[in-house]
Amino acid sequence: MNAVFFETTIFSRLRPGYLDDDGYRLLQIYMLASPESGDLMPGTGGFRKLRWHDERRGKGKRGGLRVVYYWLIDGGQIWMFSIYDKDEVSNLSADQQRQLKAAIDAELRKRGNR
């Protein structure tokens, strides 16, 4: 599959603390092969949360990183929103879920996708 990756400012700022360039490249290759691999996050309008191993801390997918992204199927785009360690955040609050949904709805309306 061909797709373009877009990063939010937050993701771009956080990513180097969790993944070096080679690790990020491996994540992108995996996501290109399986863009639906992340679990759908209820109440977010289609965001997905992908579990990813954390080589720096020797953690597998279960105890490793979480990557929040949105796959825009029609546009062949993967929008990278956030990355964090499982130990830092377990689940998003209902308010955070609503904020993600509002953000993606506004962006898709602007693009004419919703």
Residue ranges of predicted features:
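Basic/aromatic recognition patch in beta-strand/loop cores that engages polyanionic ligands
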Residues: 39-83, 88
